[in-house]
Amino acid sequence: MKYTYPNEKGYFGVFGGKYLPETLMPALEELEQQYLKIKNDGDFKRQLLYYLTEYAGRPTPLYFASRLTDVVGGAKIYLKREDLLHTGAHKINNTLGQVLLTKKIGKKRIIAETGAGQHGVSTATAASLFGLECTIYMGEEDAERQALNVFRMKLLGAEVKIVKAGSRTLKDAVNEALRDWVTNVKTTHYIIGSALGPHPFPMIVRDFQSVIGEEVKQQILEIEGKLPDVIVACVGGGSNAIGIFYPFIEDTQVRLVGVEAGGYGIETGMHAASINGGTIGVLHGMKSYFIQDEWGQIESTHSISAGLDYPGVGPEHAFLKEIKRAEYITATDEEALEGFLLLSRTEGIIPALESSHAIIKAVEIAKSLDKSKSVVINLSGRGDKDVQSVKNLLDTDKELYERLLSRLKEKYGV
């Protein structure tokens, strides 16, 4: 299959587009023109490669998780170690690219929204590296869950604005950041943290994140001599997933599996699985799947992981689901905790709760395949930021902890 999306209007099929006030259209058009000109500029590419390599720590390893593979029994499991990047997650791939873009455009200030705080930290990091003024918007509830990341951003010189409106989470932080951008568009570039928002943002973020999949393709061919059978990644807005999926879209023999946050279960209504539990609508400048009521009002979401706790999904994922090129499943909070403990105990790697959703489902898939097959998990971030909240949860819910431990013993003997 030949894949050439988005089209010139910024659509992936019916998804995507630019649903924003007229006042922002010139800024979006200018950004698109500048991006398309700059992205193939030799000097820009050299600079970006330099910082990704020397500063962020690319390429990241594609690590064969031999002990995890043994206890699961089935396909070989590989981990794409985005958790080893500077700042601890895949987010830095995008922020370095976009901050370099900001410099090229000649703007002096950057703003961003953040949920788990990872994108905020990596934006503040890149701003500090290039000497740009930086403001980060964060929902009050997320700021409480991720107090350390709030301090990290301040430490890096960013101003952190806590958003108390609405559900006080990522959706509200995006609203405030968009308001700021409308007001200060002449001096300010908005670095969206995921592959969502109005065109050209989903395309820009995807392009900067696709270094993940490009490396995987090269690495797996060197190790296995063939492409992987399955690639699994967690999906909130979807930037780590689109980053690893995109270079494989035309390789139709490779199964692409996105794992959404099932929260307490889709049937409870307390989840953040937009594709599995949402409907098509418009929010934050794009048409995609959202968790909304029958009148299009956005409903509250729930996930154990702040980074997946967003009521929508990037338009390219909506499209990949529509054309059946990728499949989207869910993992509950409890399943994610199982993945979190399992990887910690088998490989000595504490994963982010976001990535833990992908781990547990990849394990189920690997178990069903024979030993000649391979499954790649995008380990999108490390779990340091989650250790305190997992500790608090398991300290208060002893029954849950016991249940998880006995499940690990029964299923994997660990």
Curated annotation (Swiss-Prot):
| Family per similarity comment | Belongs to the TrpB family.
Q: Any idea which UniProt keywords this protein has? A: Amino-acid biosynthesis, Aromatic amino acid biosynthesis, Lyase, Pyridoxal phosphate, Tryptophan biosynthesis
Functionally, this protein is described as follows:
The beta subunit is responsible for the synthesis of L-tryptophan from indole and L-serine.
Q: Residues bearing N6-(pyridoxal phosphate)lysine? A: K91
EC annotation from Swiss-Prot or TrEMBL:
4.2.1.20
What enzyme class is recorded for this protein? lyase
Checking InterPro entries in the record gives: Trp_synth_b_CS, Trp_synth_beta, Trp_synth_beta/beta-like, TrpB-like_PALP, TrpB-like_PALP_sf
Q: What is its cofactor?
A: pyridoxal 5'-phosphate
Q: What is this protein called?
A: Tryptophan synthase beta chain
Q: Is Amino-acid biosynthesis tagged as a keyword?
A: yes
Domain of life, source organism: Bacteria
Biochemical pathway: Amino-acid biosynthesis; L-tryptophan biosynthesis; L-tryptophan from chorismate: step 5/5
Q: Catalytic activity, per the record?
A: (1S,2R)-1-C-(indol-3-yl)glycerol 3-phosphate + L-serine = D-glyceraldehyde 3-phosphate + L-tryptophan + H2O
The keyword Lyase is assigned to this record: yes
Q: Where are the transmembrane segments?
A: none
Q: Pfam families this protein is in?
A: PALP
Which is one GO molecular function term here? tryptophan synthase activity
What organism is the protein native to?
Answer: Sulfurihydrogenibium sp. (strain YO3AOP1)
Q: How does it assemble?
A: Tetramer of two alpha and two beta chains.
GO-annotated cellular components? cytoplasm
